[in-house]
């Protein structure tokens, strides 16, 4: 305001020139100044005046973002004084006049729609809008009252009549003008449905005339409902661009309406109102009773003020005679006077207050309820599927006509109509049960009337919208989406109990798809845990959703015990960024490399465990959400109180986590709900259940406090996961640590590479394809430094040899492989391709256990020249990475290593027969089971035979029957002779005639000899780091040797005896399986057993140790050939299970 403005001087809210121009146009439009005072007379140029008024609205208000013209038109009473009389005159006798039709169209289309457009208050509006909006909202209520009830003129029917010619034209022949007329007619109906009395403005007795009931009655009487039903049922065919406007009209007609009351009969509605009145009277009586306990007497109504001396010697003042009763009442009065000025966070300003308000209940009179129920039933029968299918598709493809608010309106309308359909079915069943018709005449309706919102597309759209709203913290949208999801679940639950088999199958399929996704479970849990201060409506929606979802999921999981869900977890991978800079400076590029972590979804199925899922709701945040809802217990109905009771009962007694409820404020709330003051109504049926629950909970709390007095201190605070389990059960939760397993060992496909250089090329190409160039560069640097170090040692040793020719040659020291950083150290354990490359460049791992952080070394037998050759190969492959062949990537040329030795060695022991020789099994026909071969060898032989047969099919002629029979007889004779040798060698051996004392003496003598030899080899490997190359070569061939070799069998027998002393009885299943952990030639880097820690040579080369031991036993490599008739099972092997010898029954 201007400072020079005199006191009492009026403020011009509108420019006087603008007001003068607008008033002159309204005056020139026409009036009631003719001979007949009840008849409106148009001015000489009324059509031009209407166009000028529209031009002022568009070029002044819209262009300058002001509301001056709209206010001037409201002050001049343009709508009720001019426009509505013009429409009335056209309806009563001038419908055939083209001039009057154009004027009527101008009144409706060009002026009524902008003047009745909803006004929304938001934070960014200018001061001019804030000055005019209260007045314009008041004027719009007057506009609505005039449109709904103007004498005997049905103005809504007149407005619809103006648009009928445009509707009669087919969609293909409809012009842009026709589409605009239809759209503006629907917008006018939408504006009428939205306009309501503002509670902050002074009312003038027109609340009933502009209420929701009056709107619904006018829509029914003037055929607006018939128009809406016609257009909704033909959406997509004749009307494609009007879907969003129709949705808004339907939304504003049904929002806030109680579905249960809507479908009640007159008798039920009257009984309901009687019950509500009785409940209000009982509340009033209880309040009076509470007041009467502490009310003053007739002669003691004087003011009272007392001082209360507290424990800390401070004084507090309390007023009122009710504090004189006792100390408890005084303290309670003090608590009521306390206020906690909690700092409030700035709330996000909603741009559309009118459209968000679907939580406020709306009361309808009986006539309006009947009219709206008729419209809803006809809409469900004809217009539900077309409208909501078309709206969903438009929202999904983000059409231009779609606004942000339409998604919220869509989900709320779907939820409301689904509840209406379920309520209608209940009323139909009740009506039929009360009728005199036979039950067999009643045919249940199918759920196909609402099938458009029960398909997979709707579920995907709903889940995506819920996740987006939750991430963006759009709580109003999430509220509507939660309501929709809840009603879908309840509808599916009713479909499952339908007598129609088709509905039951559809319900089963829908439940399977809803509960299959674990992301849905996690989202509902996150919504419940994420409640903060979103309001009562949001709190009601999220608690109802969690209650219904848990109940249905529990029932479904019990009916489907083998229920599977798809679990999605994040698997991190590193992706190298493209480097920019000088290409020649390779070292600088390597040092400046950056890595970006990306998360990709990895999906897998797993068995669903309902107890595990329900336990996720046992946390303090979920409990706080339901406690916040319980604080409204005075306003909650029986269903809501039952929902709270079921959750708290599940927490305290089903999940055995009652300690979560042991908090002072929660216990105080439960106590006040039962004992008061201001407790629950004891006449409600749910009161008894709550009373028993609170009694049992307090009893358990007292018992827990007696057991663990520390709980008294914990009652002041929320429980945390680290102490919650101990407070409940009295001991810490036992957890099992899971160690990381090494990745599966990879090899290069033999068909793709034969030489080591080709294998290195393929592995490096695969690493480069994965963006692991840094690891290859690090490996090249390790080889370079190792070559320099080895070369320096060789030069030093050569110089020492020249000085002292008799000096023995010192072995090369092992060179440790040091990772560059922690990521590289992790890759050395978890990256299977890098481990394969390290093995190809002759690196070796120290120790038996393959664990994170295991040491790798450059072995002693590699010379500096060998290391430089390997480095040159790696550098060449890194400079020009292998890109693969035409149809195969380098990664496809790698495969998992097939453990042939283990399977081939373990198989014979599983095929040993333990039958009694004296029972007739030693007949020629059943000498012994066929020669057991390893699975891997048999598979390879079978593949070779098949390939040979395929190659020779076209060359050789088919054999005759005589030749085939001769070959079969020869095979049988050969097999019989081989089985005889195996049986005699296995069951008859030299140890049968020996006594136990002699066997023990021989065993200990061999053990002492072997221990000395092993200690000497360990000492040489640790101190000198040298193992003969001959031992390596011999060891490799010996590892391929079958354990049927007599020397190996004899040696393994002694080791097996030692194993019997070390392996506990619990491992008898492992022994019977045929796996012997320490058998020579059978050990692998991946196996783990208790016997690996028996020796002190964990830091020695396991590979060299085995090869040297094998070379000592087997001699030269040339003697390692096996005869075809050599038995597979070791002749001297003794096997035990639980202390019993099971090699032979004769012993």
From Swiss-Prot:
Acidic residues bias (residue ranges): 584-597
Compartment(s): Nucleus
Pfam families in alphabetical order: TIMELESS
Coiled-coil stretches noted in the UniProt entry, renumbered to this chain: none
Molecular function as annotated in GO: DNA binding
Ranges of biased composition (kind: Polar residues): 907-916
Biased composition (Basic residues): 566-575
Region of interest (Disordered), ranges: 564-598, 799-823, 898-1002, 1027-1147
Keywords: Cell cycle, DNA damage, DNA repair, DNA replication inhibitor, Meiosis, Nucleus
Summary of subunit composition and partner proteins: Component of the fork protection complex (FPC) consisting of tof1 and csm3.
Name of this chain's protein: Topoisomerase 1-associated factor 1
Species of provenance: Aspergillus terreus (strain NIH 2624 / FGSC A1156)
């Amino acid at each position: 305001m201007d400072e020079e403005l005199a006191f009492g001087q009026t403020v011009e809210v509108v420019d006087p020139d603008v007001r003068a121009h607008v008033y002159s146009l309204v005056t020139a439009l026409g009036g009631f100044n003719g001979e007949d005072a009840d008849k409106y007379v148009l001015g000489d140029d009324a059509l031009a005046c209407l166009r000028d008024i529209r031009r002022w609205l568009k070029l002044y208000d819209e262009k300058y973002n002001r509301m001056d013209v709209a206010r001037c038109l409201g002050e001049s009473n343009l709508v009720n004084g001019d426009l509505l009389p013009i429409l009335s005159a056209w309806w009563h006798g001038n419908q055939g006049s083209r001039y009057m039709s154009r004027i009527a169209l101008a009144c409706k289309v060009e002026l009524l729609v902008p003047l009745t457009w909803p006004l929304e208050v938001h934070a960014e509006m200018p001061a001019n809008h804030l000055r005019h909006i209260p007045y314009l909202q008041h004027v719009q209520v007057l506009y609505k009252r005039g449109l709904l009830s103007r004498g005997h003129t049905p103005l809504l029917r007149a407005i619809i009549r103006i648009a009928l010619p445009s509707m009669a034209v087919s969609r293909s022949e409809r012009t842009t003008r026709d589409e605009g007329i239809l759209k503006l007619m629907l917008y006018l109906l939408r504006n009428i449905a939205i306009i309501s009395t503002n509670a902050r403005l002074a009312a003038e007795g027109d609340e009933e005339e502009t209420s929701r009931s009056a709107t619904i009655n006018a829509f029914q009487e003037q055929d607006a409902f018939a128009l809406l039903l016609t257009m909704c049922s033909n959406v997509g065919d004749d009307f494609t661009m009007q879907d969003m406007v129709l949705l808004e009209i339907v939304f504003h007609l049904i929002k806030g309406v109680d579905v249960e009351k809507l479908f009640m009969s007159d008798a039920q509605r009257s009984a309901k109102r009687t019950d509500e009145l009785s409940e209000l009277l009982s509340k009033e009586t209880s309040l009076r009773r509470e007041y009467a306990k502490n009310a003053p007497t007739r002669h003691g109504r004087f003011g009272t003020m007392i001082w209360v001396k507290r424990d800390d010697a401070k004084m507090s003042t309390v007023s009122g005679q009710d504090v004189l009763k006792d100390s408890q009442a005084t303290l309670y009065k003090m608590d009521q006077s306390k206020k906690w000025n909690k700092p409030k966070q700035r709330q996000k300003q909603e741009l559309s207050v009118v459209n968000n308000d679907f939580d406020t209940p709306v009361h309808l009179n009986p006539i309006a309820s009947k009219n709206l129920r008729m419209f809803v039933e006809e809409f469900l029968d004809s217009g539900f599927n077309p409208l909501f299918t078309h709206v969903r598709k438009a929202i999904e493809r983000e059409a231009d006509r779609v606004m942000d608010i339409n998604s919220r309106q869509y989900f709320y309308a779907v939820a409301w109509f689904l509840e209406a359909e379920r309520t209608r079915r209940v009323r139909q069943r009740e009506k039929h049960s009360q009728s005199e018709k036979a039950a067999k005449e009643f045919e249940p309706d199918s759920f196909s009337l609402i099938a458009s919102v029960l398909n997979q597309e709707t579920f995907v759209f709903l889940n995506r919208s819920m996740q987006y709203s939750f991430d963006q913290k759009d709580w109003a949208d999430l509220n509507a989406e939660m309501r929709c999801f809840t009603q879908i679940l309840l509808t599916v639950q009713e479909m499952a109990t339908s007598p129609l088999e088709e509905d039951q199958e559809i319900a089963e399929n829908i439940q399977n798809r809803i509960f299959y996704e674990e992301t849905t479970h996690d989202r509902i849990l996150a919504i419940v845990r994420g409640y903060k201060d979103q309001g009562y409506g949001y709190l009601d929606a999220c608690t109802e959703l969690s209650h219904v979802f848990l109940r249905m999921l529990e029932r479904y999981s019990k009916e489907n015990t083998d229920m599977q869900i798809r679990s999605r977890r994040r698997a991190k991978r590193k992706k190298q960024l493209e480097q920019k800079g000088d290409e020649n400076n390779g070292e600088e590029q390597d040092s400046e490399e950056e890595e970006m972590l990306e998360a990709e979804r990895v999906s897998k199925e797993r068995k669903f465990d309902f107890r595990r899922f329900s336990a996720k709701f046992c946390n303090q945040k979920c409990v706080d959400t339901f406690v916040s809802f319980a604080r409204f217990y005075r306003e909650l109905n029986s269903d809501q109180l039952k929902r709270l009771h079921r959750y708290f009962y599940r927490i305290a007694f089903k999940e055995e986590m009652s300690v979560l409820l042991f908090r002072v404020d929660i216990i105080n709330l439960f106590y006040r709900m039962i004992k008061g003051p201001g407790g629950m109504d004891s006449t409600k049926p749910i009161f008894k259940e709550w009373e028993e629950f609170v009694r049992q909970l307090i009893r358990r709390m007292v018992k827990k406090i007696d057991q663990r007095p520390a709980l008294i201190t914990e009652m002041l605070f929320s429980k945390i996961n680290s102490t919650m389990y101990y407070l409940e059960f009295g001991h810490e939760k036992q957890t099992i640590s899971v160690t990381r397993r090494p990745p599966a060992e990879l090899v290069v496909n033999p068909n793709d590479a034969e030489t080591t250089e080709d294998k290195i090329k393929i592995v490096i190409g695969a690493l480069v394809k994965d963006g692991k160039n840094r690891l290859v560069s690090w490996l090249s640097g390790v080889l370079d430094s190792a070559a320099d170090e080895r070369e320096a040692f060789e030069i030093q040793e050569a110089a020492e040899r020249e000085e002292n020719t008799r000096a023995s040659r010192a072995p090369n020291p092992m060179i440790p492989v040091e990772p560059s950083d922690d990521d590289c150290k992790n890759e050395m354990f978890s990256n299977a391709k890098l481990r394969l490359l390290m093995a190809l460049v002759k690196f070796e791992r120290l120790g038996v256990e393959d664990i994170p952080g295991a040491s790798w070394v450059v072995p002693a037998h590699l010379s500096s020249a060998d290391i430089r050759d390997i480095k040159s190969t790696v550098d060449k492959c890194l400079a020009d990475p292998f890109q693969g062949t035409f149809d195969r990537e380098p990664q496809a040329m790698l495969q998992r290593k097939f453990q042939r030795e283990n399977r081939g060695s373990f198989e014979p022991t599983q095929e040993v027969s333990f039958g009694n020789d004296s029972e007739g099994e030693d007949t020629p026909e059943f000498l012994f089971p066929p020669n057991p071969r390893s699975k891997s060898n048999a598979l390879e032989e079978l593949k070779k035979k098949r390939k040979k047969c395929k190659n020779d099919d076209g060359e050789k002629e088919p054999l005759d029957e005589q030749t085939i029979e001769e070959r079969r007889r020869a095979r049988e004779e050969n097999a019989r002779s081989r089985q005889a040798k195996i049986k005699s060698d296995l069951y008859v051996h030299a140890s049968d005639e020996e006594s136990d004392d002699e066997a023990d003496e021989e065993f200990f003598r061999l053990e002492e000899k072997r221990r000395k030899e092993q200690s000497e080899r360990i000492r040489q490997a640790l101190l000198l780091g040298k193992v003969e190359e001959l031992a390596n070569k011999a060891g490799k061939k010996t590892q391929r040797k079958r354990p049927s070799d007599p020397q190996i069998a004899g040696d393994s027998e002694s080791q097996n005896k030692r194993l019997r002393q070390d392996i506990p009885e619990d491992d008898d299943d492992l022994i019977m399986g045929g796996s012997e952990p320490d058998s020579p030639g059978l050990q692998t880097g991946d196996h783990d057993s208790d016997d690996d820690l028996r020796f002190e040579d964990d830091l020695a080369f396991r590979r060299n140790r085995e090869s040297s031991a094998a070379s000592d036993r087997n001699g030269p490599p040339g003697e390692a050939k096996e005869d075809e008739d050599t038995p597979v099972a070791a002749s001297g092997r003794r096997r035990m299970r639980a202390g019993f010898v099971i090699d032979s029954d004769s012993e």
